[in-house]
C-alpha cells in the first residue's frame, strides 16, 4: 500500500481514538498489523502522529491553556497552581515510562498484549460505572493536588498498550470523586504534557532512523490526526454528560474476538 495512504489511514485511526476510552495505541497496533506497517519505525510513527491530536486539544481548550500563562482573577485552575496540578498528574507516568520504556516497546506493543488490555480495561470501566458514588469535584477549579496526583497514578495504566490513557484517567477521576464530564475534560487537558513528553523522548531516541524522505509521511499523519481528533473530542464532550463508559466497554469487548481471530490466533 502507498506510504502516504497508510499514513492517512493510521492518522485517522489515531485521531478518532486518542481521546476516547477505547485505546488509540491498541487500534494503531492492530491497524498497522493489518496494513503490514510494523516494527520499530511503525511504533515511533504511532507516537509522533500524536502531535496532531495534541494540537487539536490545544485548539479546543486554548482558553484553559492560556489561563496557565495569564491567569484570570478568581480562577483556581490557572497560573502556577494549574501548572503544578498538571505536573502532579504527569509525574507518575513519566517516571515509570522512563524506567520501562525499552521493555514496553519490546514486549507490550504486540497484538496479544493489546487484546488482554482491551478486555481488562473494558471490565474495569463496567465495574467503575456500576459503583455508586457522589461526586465531590464538579469543575476544574475544584481540582486538588491529591486528586491530580491520584489521576496521575491511574494514568500509569496507559503504559500498557490497549488499556487506554483516556479510560485510565477518566476512571481514576471518577473513583476519586470527579464528576464524569470533569474527569473527561481533565483527561484531555492532562494528556498534553504527558503526550508531548512521550513524543519528544521517542523522537530523540529514534531520530537517526528517519530521513528527509519521511517528512511527507509524518506531515500527512499529523494533519490527519489533528482533523479527526478535533471531530472526536467535540462529539465525545457533547455526549459524555449524558452517557456512561459502558458503551465504550461493550465496544472493546465486541472487537476483542476479531482481534484474537485476525491478530493473535
UniProtKB/Swiss-Prot annotation:
Keywords: Antibiotic resistance, Cell inner membrane, Cell membrane, Cell shape, Cell wall biogenesis/degradation, Hydrolase, Membrane, Peptidoglycan synthesis, Transmembrane, Transmembrane helix
GO-annotated molecular function: undecaprenyl-diphosphatase activity
Gene Ontology cellular-component terms listed: plasma membrane
Xref: Pfam families: BacA
Keyword Electron transport set for record: no
Protein family per UniProt: Belongs to the UppP family.
Protein name as annotated: Undecaprenyl-diphosphatase
Amino acid at each position: 500500500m502507498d506510504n502516504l495512504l497508510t499514513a492517512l489511514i493510521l492518522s485517522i485511526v489515531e485521531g478518532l481514538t486518542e481521546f476516547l476510552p477505547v485505546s488509540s495505541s491498541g487500534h494503531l497496533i492492530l491497524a498497522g498489523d493489518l496494513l503490514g506497517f510494523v516494527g520499530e519505525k511503525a511504533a515511533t510513527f504511532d507516537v509522533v502522529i500524536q502531535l496532531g491530536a495534541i494540537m487539536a486539544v490545544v485548539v479546543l481548550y486554548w482558553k484553559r491553556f492560556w489561563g496557565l500563562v495569564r491567569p484570570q482573577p478568581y480562577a483556581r485552575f490557572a497560573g502556577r497552581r494549574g501548572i503544578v496540578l498538571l505536573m502532579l498528574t504527569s509525574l507518575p507516568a513519566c517516571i515509570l515510562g522512563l524506567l520501562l520504556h525499552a521493555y514496553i516497546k519490546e514486549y507490550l506493543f504486540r497484538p496479544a498484549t493489546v487484546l488482554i488490555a482491551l478486555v481488562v480495561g473494558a471490565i474495569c470501566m463496567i465495574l467503575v460505572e456500576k459503583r455508586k458514588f457522589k461526586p465531590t469535584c464538579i469543575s476544574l477549579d475544584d481540582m486538588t493536588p491529591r486528586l491530580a496526583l491520584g489521576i496521575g497514578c491511574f494514568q500509569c495504566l496507559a503504559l500498557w498498550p490497549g488499556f487506554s490513557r483516556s479510560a485510565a484517567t477518566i476512571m481514576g477521576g471518577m473513583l476519586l470523586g470527579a464528576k464524569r464530564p470533569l474527569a473527561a475534560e481533565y483527561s484531555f487537558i492532562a494528556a498534553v504534557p504527558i503526550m508531548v513528553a512521550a513524543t519528544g523522548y521517542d523522537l530523540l531516541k529514534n531520530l537517526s532512523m528517519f530521513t528527509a524522505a519521511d517528512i511527507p509521511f509524518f506531515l500527512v499523519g499529523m494533519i490527519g490526526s489533528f482533523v479527526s481528533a478535533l471531530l472526536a473530542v467535540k462529539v465525545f464532550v457533547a455526549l459524555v454528560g449524558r452517557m456512561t463508559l459502558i458503551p465504550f466497554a461493550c465496544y472493546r469487548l465486541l472487537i476483542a474476538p476479531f482481534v484474537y481471530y485476525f491478530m493473535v490466533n
